[in-house]
């Protein structure tokens, strides 16, 4: 990195860390029902909503009621979005007269946005109307983010409460999360993004003439959209001359803010945050990365404050930061070393393919690692154009169950599942009954934590294996060999871990990938969520056990190091064979 890039990266983390404590404290006050600066504004709104919906805010739920409420809430929103996509052609705010989605694509997209994945088998500006973007996708960006956050809060309550059967009230937690956290921050973020040049309008798309006409050859397609080939098997092409271009418009800033803040990631445009109307300047780029990490980072301090020991939260944050910074370093090194095949031609330099020059390599490295360490999935660089090792970094961060900050809420509760595993294994090694925050870790907690950690990994390997042996899966691959495997592995890793980014060389808009992806996203989201709630419910019922000489201190550096090793070892044991056949093999082939 040059001095400017070092300064940019260091300053970013300094500002982020400076806001972790005050923002984490604010979120703790919100979920504990304490007074905040926004209480005079939102308490009347909150109480009005409870009266309208018939919610008793003092009626706390056990883990089963909490889980059922969460599942019902998400089911209603999934069905509503599915219907909206099927009816898009007759709904308002559709100046381009875009048609309805096909049912497989509508199903995949509805589940994608409900689960906070935002996997997109369509191009936003070419397929989704303004009504769909605002009342469908943007609304789900709020609801899916709130769902993840409140599950994490319920998990914290399970750890800190004693001899209790209650984890809180899902409806109250979701209302407070949306009113006090997501809406105010999204408003501020949207205003800032508009100041940087992100568009916000309802104008029809603009058609403008080009200064110079452009001609090129493109493959001819049959009625089914399949490329036509001649007798020798070569693609049949036709000459096309372009004299004008269509520039898409839309209410982008309002959606861009919650897209990053809620670690959703679904782009208004197909190019996502590489598009200048979504992410126009280096400052907007840094700001969007900041939004991606803010809530997930702040929740670690929220956890420590609610647990009565803020060092517990700092320990988890240290683990997240250590792995994230390591990932940034490996990514930067791989991309700055360039492409070995290009270097053999005598052309040396960094790999800038698929990257935006206005962000540079440092801005691309920071964004790519942040968006895959969390469940965001937004991209400002094309991950399919990365070097094999550079591409393996975001893929590996996703495969680690996205605990490196992770999605809003999901990152923290998955990290807590890893903590339970680490405490249990350490207890076995020293011959002591494992304890965490004064609660004994027993068989139920281990089953639930293992389910939380391994569910997505099992889905990734099963669906990737199926895709590689079925013609329906292989036919969507535009690349063969090691890179083709990496594309399929990345796709199901992204969907199963609710990330949403992709190696774009894979055609996902097929019946096979729409349906298998929908199943992967559903199970990857809700199996760990219910398992965490079950674990929290069991822990809440337990009595407090005072620390003794044999208690493992979990708020100190040795445990943070042990937790880091457990995360990396679990990830390596699960996915190293697949990575060896994918990006590692591709890198070795390129270096021959």
Curated annotation (Swiss-Prot):
**Where, per UniProt, does this protein localize?**
Cell inner membrane
Q: How does it sit in the membrane?
A: Multi-pass membrane protein
Q: Which GO terms describe its molecular function?
A: P-type potassium transmembrane transporter activity; potassium ion binding
**Where are the membrane-spanning stretches?**
6-26, 67-87, 136-156, 179-199, 283-303, 312-332, 359-379, 389-409, 411-431, 450-470, 489-511, 519-539, 559-579
What is the annotated quaternary arrangement, including any partners? Answer: The system is composed of three essential subunits: KdpA, KdpB and KdpC.
**Function text:** Part of the high-affinity ATP-driven potassium transport (or Kdp) system, which catalyzes the hydrolysis of ATP coupled with the electrogenic transport of potassium into the cytoplasm. This subunit binds the periplasmic potassium ions and delivers the ions to the membrane domain of KdpB through an intramembrane tunnel.
**What's this protein's family per the entry?**
Belongs to the KdpA family.
Protein name (Swiss-Prot/TrEMBL)? Potassium-transporting ATPase potassium-binding subunit
Q: Write down the species.
A: Geotalea uraniireducens (strain Rf4)
GN (gene name): kdpA
């Amino acid at each position: 990195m040059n001095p400017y890039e070092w300064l940019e990266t260091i300053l970013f983390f300094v500002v982020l860390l400076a806001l972790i404590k005050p923002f984490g404290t604010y979120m703790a006050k919100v979920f504990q029902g304490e007074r905040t600066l926004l209480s005079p504004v939102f308490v009347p709104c909150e109480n009005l909503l409870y009266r309208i919906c018939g919610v008793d805010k003092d009626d706390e739920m056990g883990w089963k009621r909490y889980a059922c409420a969460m599942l019902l809430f998400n089911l209603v929103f999934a069905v509503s979005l599915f219907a909206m996509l099927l009816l898009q052609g007759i709904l308002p705010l559709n100046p381009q007269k875009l048609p309805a989605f096909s049912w497989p694509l509508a199903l995949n997209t509805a589940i994608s946005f409900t689960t906070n994945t935002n996997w997109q088998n369509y191009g936003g500006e070419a397929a989704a109307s303004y009504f769909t973007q605002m009342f469908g996708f943007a609304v789900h960006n709020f609801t899916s983010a709130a769902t993840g956050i409140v599950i994490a809060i319920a998990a914290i309550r399970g750890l800190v409460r004693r001899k209790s059967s209650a984890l809180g009230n899902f409806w109250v937690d979701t209302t407070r999360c949306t009113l006090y956290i997501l809406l105010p921050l999204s408003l501020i973020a949207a205003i800032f993004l508009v100041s940087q040049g992100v568009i916000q309008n309802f104008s029809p798309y603009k058609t403008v003439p080009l200064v110079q006409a452009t001609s090129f050859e493109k493959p001819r397609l049959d009625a089914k959209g399949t490329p036509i080939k001649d007798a020798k098997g070569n693609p049949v092409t036709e000459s096309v001359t372009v004299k004008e271009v269509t520039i898409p418009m839309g209410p982008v800033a309002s959606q861009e803010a919650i897209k990053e803040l809620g670690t959703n990631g679904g782009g208004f445009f197909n190019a996502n945050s590489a598009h200048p109307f979504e992410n126009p300047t280096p400052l907007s780029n840094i700001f969007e990365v900041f939004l991606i990490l803010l809530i997930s980072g702040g929740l670690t301090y929220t956890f420590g404050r609610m647990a009565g020991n803020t060092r517990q939260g700092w320990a988890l944050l240290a683990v997240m930061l250590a792995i994230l910074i390591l990932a940034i370093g490996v990514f930067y090194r791989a991309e700055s070393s360039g492409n070995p095949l290009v270097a053999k031609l005598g052309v040396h330099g960094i790999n800038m393919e698929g990257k935006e020059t206005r962000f540079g390599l440092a801005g691309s490295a920071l964004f790519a690692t942040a968006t895959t360490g969390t469940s965001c999935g937004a991209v400002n660089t094309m991950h399919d154009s990365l070097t094999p090792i550079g591409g393996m970094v975001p893929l590996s961060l996703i495969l680690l169950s996205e605990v490196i900050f992770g999605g809003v809420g999901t990152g923290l509760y998955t990290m807590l599942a890893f903590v339970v595993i680490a405490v249990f294994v350490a207890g076995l090694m020293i011959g002591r009954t494992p304890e965490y925050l004064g609660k004994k870790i027993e068989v139920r907690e281990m089953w639930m934590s293992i389910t939380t950690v391994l569910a997505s990994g099992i889905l990734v390997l099963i669906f990737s294996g199926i895709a590689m042996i079925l013609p329906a899966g292989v036919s969507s691959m535009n690349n063969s060999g090691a890179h083709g495997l990496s594309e399929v592995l990345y796709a199901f890793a992204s969907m199963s871990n609710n990330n949403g980014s992709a190696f774009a060389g894979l055609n996902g808009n097929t019946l096979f990938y729409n349906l298998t992806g929908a199943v992967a996203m559903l199970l990857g989201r809700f199996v760990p969520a219910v398992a965490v709630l079950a674990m929290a419910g069991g822990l809440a019922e337990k009595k407090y056990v005072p620390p003794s000489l044999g208690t493992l201190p979990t708020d100190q550096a040795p445990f943070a190091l042990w937790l880091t090793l457990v995360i990396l070892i679990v990830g390596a044991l699960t996915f190293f064979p697949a990575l060896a056949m994918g990006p590692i093999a591709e890198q070795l082939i390129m270096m021959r």
